[in-house]
Amino acid sequence: MEPIWLLLLLAIFTVSVSAQFNGYNCDANQHSRFPAERDITVYCGVQTITMKINFCTVLFSGYSESDLSLNGKHGDAHCRGFINNNTFPAVVIFTINLSTLESCENSLVVSTVPGVNAYGIASMVQIGNISGYIDTPDPPTIISYLPGLLYKFSCSYPLEYLVNNTQLASSSAAISVREGNGTFISTLNLLLYNDSTYSQQLLIPSAGLPLKTKIYAAVRATNLDGRWNVLMDYCYTTPSGNPSDDIRYDLFLSCDKDPQTTIFENGKSQMGRFSFEVFRFVKHKNQKMSTVFLHCITKLCRSDDCHYLTPTCHNRDRRDAVIRTTLTPYSLSGNAVVSAGPIITRSDETPANNSQLAHPGNQQFQINSVTSALISGVVILGATSLSFFIIALTLLNRKKQNSLVLCGIRNPVFN
């Protein structure tokens, strides 16, 4: 009889457990417990934050999916989750859209702290933190035999990114950045145009661009909600596609700006715009064409706080770019590097600059301006000396003729 009673009790327990989990994808041995911290998983994205809660432990605690809501908003259906029974264990999924995160009273706190950017340069860094909680409602009675459930979540967003464009012939590049403090994926574009209206994208001819050609550049962020703006912190150029190249020329860094660079918009929208004139690197002096690669360190700042991060400049002299040519990146971890081809410039040398003279030894040398000036001086001096010699000789002959007339023999006929 005892084995029969044991089998009967086991069957009753199995039926009660099955009834408790209501046929959801749960395991009685693993999930017959109250919720723990490991029962919530948070995914932080640029457009949405997703939370997955173990639904089996919620059922064991005596609640259903309709009892869980964001930040105590139990009367708002938009702040509730939905069940996914295609996973093990079954989960309740909550999704927060960052563009409307205040609708369920989620909290956004942006802190600005001193720090260094990817190149070791002192800069103000912004950190965005979005937080909230998921809970069950309080019972209407004075006491309750059910535990109250509370799940907390938080996502931190580092807002500084390195975007560089190293194949500017294609006039655009896009990158995706994944940061360690949560998953923050953003698309940044560096676009080049040949007009101030930013309507015609730049096409670089195979022969290269003439020197001093004006290029209009724009750094733009997409897939972001309206609370974020783009703030260009540091833009510079290198002769190679390596943003860590020891040789670099700064276009602008804070208030220090190249005289040929003009900033039109920065920190006021999701696009930063500036222009600069094409130049060549001296290291390419023996080449008919020079390559220039553009790189920018870009911040994302909250639209209300961008003006605090934008420097106030009052006729400051630009620092010499050579001072920073020996800087090396502090760290490139967590920053994305994109390559999109070089700006090609031509030297536009004149025939006078290319004129050469043949040497008997089949060697060639080039007449520079100093040698030309010396030769001209010698020719002028020789011509002047010859003129003085001819004048002196003429005067001497005239004097000799006059002397012969005065000292001549007296003609007896005149007697």
Curated annotation (Swiss-Prot):
Extracellular topological segments = 20-372
Cytoplasmic-side positions: 394-415
Role, per record: Glycoprotein which is a component of the gelatinous extracellular matrix in the cupulae of the vestibular organ.
- List site positions: Cleavage: R319, D320
Give all residue intervals belonging to the ZP domain: 43-320
Provide this UniProt record's keywords sorted from A to Z.
Cytoplasmic vesicle, Disulfide bond, Extracellular matrix, Membrane, Secreted, Signal, Transmembrane, Transmembrane helix
Which organism was this protein described from?
A: Xenopus laevis (African clawed frog)
List the Pfam families hit by this protein, alphabetically. Zona_pellucida
One GO cellular-component annotation of the UniProt record comes to:
cell surface
Which cysteines bridge via disulfide bonds? C44-C155, C79-C104, C235-C296, C255-C313
ATP-binding found in the keyword field: no
Gene coding for it: zpld1
What does the PTM comment of the record read?
Proteolytically cleaved before the transmembrane segment to yield the secreted form found in the extracellular matrix of the cupula.
Its name, as the record gives it, is Zona pellucida-like domain-containing protein 1
**Entry's transmembrane regions:** 373-393
Where in the sequence is the signal peptide annotated? 1-19
